[in-house]
A protein has these predicted regions:
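Generic beta-strand/beta-sheet core signal
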Residues: 33-36, 50, 94, 138-140, ...
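A general structural signal for stabilizing positions within well-ordered secondary structure
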Residues: 12, 38, 83, 127-129, ...
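N-terminal cap/lid segment of alpha/beta-hydrolase-fold proteins
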Residues: 3-42, 46
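Conserved G/P- and acidic residue-centered "switch" motifs that form tight phosphate/ATP-binding loops
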Residues: 28, 98, 139
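Short alpha-helical segments and helix-capping/turn motifs at coil-helix boundaries
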Residues: 31-35, 76-79, 144-149
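Cap/lid segment of the alpha/beta-hydrolase catalytic domain
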Residues: 41-126
Length: 165
């Protein structure tokens, strides 16, 4: 895709941040999420990702990295909330159970809870007044892998996933 005729959407919105909102999983465990959303009324499409590293590590003020650089040169694997929210998306970054501010014990990587917890949070997002119910998964590396696990559970409001790297 070398044609330069594509157009990148322009930033339109400022961002509202709501930290450590607790979402109840199907087994009663409370999962901590941070919500990033446009500062305007209305419903917006959603983006979701879940972190085994702690959601707070995904919003460092990291300067742009050089093209072709390694993923290890960047801190944000979830995607940049400021970029997406400014363009009309709401974004939720969650702590995996037993990690960061979420309750419970971490059952280990690649457990059934990654899919179930992702499903439950996506469906919670769809019920919020700021989300239009169209939700996509985003992220690189482990964040990309968890999208596959979550998609396998077939949340009704998950419309697409975009794992990369």
């Amino acid at each position: 895709m070398t044609d330069k005729s594509y157009h990148l959407s322009q930033p339109t919105y400022k961002m509202i941040v709501e930290e450590n909102i607790m979402v109840t999983a199907r087994d009663g465990v409370k999962l901590a999420v941070d919500v990033y959303r446009p500062d305007a009324p209305g419903e917006f499409p959603g983006l979701f990702t879940i972190s085994v590293y702690g959601k707070s590590t995904q919003t460092f003020d990291t300067p742009p990295q050089p093209f072709g650089g390694s993923v290890f040169e960047a801190a944000i694997e979830a995607g940049d909330p400021e970029f997406f929210v400014a363009r009309g998306y709401c974004m939720v970054i969650a702590d995996y159970r037993g990690i960061g501010d979420s309750e419970g014990e971490m059952p280990g990587m690649f457990s059934k809870y990654e899919g179930e917890d992702g499903y439950d949070i996506i469906e919670w997002m769809a019920e919020q007044p700021w989300c239009n119910g169209n939700i996509g998964g985003v992220g690189i590396c482990y964040f990309g892998f968890t999208q596959l696990i979550i998609a396998e559970t077939q949340p009704p409001h998950l419309k697409c996933i975009a794992p990369w790297e």
